[in-house]
């Protein structure tokens, strides 16, 4: 009976099992080696993957799951974004000061807190949630920022990998859902037009290339609209 139940698990359920197992391992790492240099990056990777899985769950609950065409368009837009960010960041010289250094400095502070202990790092992230959500973002941007040279441009580019995929998936689900509500006849062209137009909206990328990951909040906004 157990083997039959295991075979009936969906990919999302398997993802949930995997995330749960990784959470246990992370908890053990935090207890046994609280100042480990690997804890914060691994926790960040786990959080980003978990958020992506939750986004897929939101699409399923809303009845707006993506087909092969939708996934291909989303991947294409993401690939264009990677090239765009790389070209923009490598072809300019920008000094990250004032507000433009705010998130970058918070990321440094989060890394310093986790270098003390896992408890100190978690206290830094969640201790100010009632007043300021910006510390929470550092949980998701640490990976792959931890693999870079820790510059402002590196922080901006890291968002393409830790924030944009989940954001695009939810945006795609929202476009699909609106198309269902409006009973669009040619849903393929509608989706292509809707995704291209929305993803090209300048305010989705202008602050991101300036090391301000405020578009992270749109993930929760899109999920709420879907549900």
How would you describe each model-predicted region?
Residues 32-37, 83-102, 209:
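Helix-to-loop transition at the C-terminal end of transmembrane segments
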Residues 1-86:
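Start-transfer (signal-anchor) and selected internal transmembrane alpha helices
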Residues 216-227:
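Specific aromatic-rich, kink-prone transmembrane helix
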Residues 36, 40, 69, 150-158, ...:
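Membrane-interface starts of transmembrane alpha-helices
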Residues 90-108, 115-143, 150-153:
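Extracytoplasmic catalytic/substrate-binding loops of multi-pass membrane glycan-assembly enzymes
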Residues 203-216:
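Short acidic/glycine- and proline-prone juxtamembrane loop motifs at membrane-interface regions
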Residues 157-184:
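Transmembrane-helix motifs of polytopic, lipid-linked glycan transferases
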Residues 190-199:
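Short helix- or helix-capping micro-motifs
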């Amino acid at each position: 009976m157990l083997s039959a139940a295991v075979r009936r698990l969906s990919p999302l359920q398997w993802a949930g099992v995997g995330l749960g197992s990784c959470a246990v391992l992370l908890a053990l790492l935090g207890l046994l080696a609280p100042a480990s240099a690997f804890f914060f990056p691994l926790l960040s990777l786990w959080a980003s993957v978990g958020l992506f899985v939750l986004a897929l769950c939101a699409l399923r609950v809303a009845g707006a799951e993506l087909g092969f065409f939708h996934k291909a368009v989303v991947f294409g837009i993401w690939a264009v974004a990677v090239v765009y960010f790389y070209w923009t960041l490598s072809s300019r010289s920008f000094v990250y000061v004032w507000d433009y250094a705010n998130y970058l400095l918070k990321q440094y502070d989060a890394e310093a807190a986790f270098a003390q202990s896992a408890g100190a790092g978690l206290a830094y992230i969640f201790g100010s949630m009632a007043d300021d959500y910006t510390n929470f973002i550092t949980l998701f941007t640490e990976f792959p920022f931890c693999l870079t040279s820790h510059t402002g441009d590196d922080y901006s580019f890291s968002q393409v990998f830790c924030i944009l995929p989940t954001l695009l998936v939810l945006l795609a689900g929202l476009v699909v859902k609106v198309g269902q509500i409006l009973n669009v006849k040619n849903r393929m062209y509608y989706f292509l037009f809707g995704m291209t137009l929305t993803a090209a909206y300048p305010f989705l990328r202008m602050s991101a290339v300036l090391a301000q990951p405020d578009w992270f909040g749109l993930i929760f906004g899109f999920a709420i609209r879907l549900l």
